[in-house]
Amino acid sequence: MCMKALTKYAWNGVLLHFKQEMTVTNEPGIYLEGKFGVRIENTLLIVPAESTAFGDFLKFETLTLAPIDTAPIVLEMLSTEEREWLNNYHCRVYESLFPYLEGNDKEWLRKATLPI
């Protein structure tokens, strides 16, 4: 897994530092001018990752548990790591939600979270 250091970000020109227990959103998207836009949004919790000689590190824990529609994904454009992330995310979604569903909803969730 690729670990990237991200310690701060800018919001409306104001520099903010990430801190434990903050929530943020990850909102990748595409917008076609004059046509439409599509965005996938996940809420993330900032949690401790590890402590080393270089300091204490944080990581993101995904809070949102909803399947991501894979129909528009061009699989050849995804790296191995991106496929693994999506499959692991869908596995977590399935395992977390399946016990609370019944009948057709269970089947819908199973299909929506199949590995790619």
Annotate each predicted stretch with a short phrase:
Residues M1-I116:
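Charged, cofactor-coupling segments
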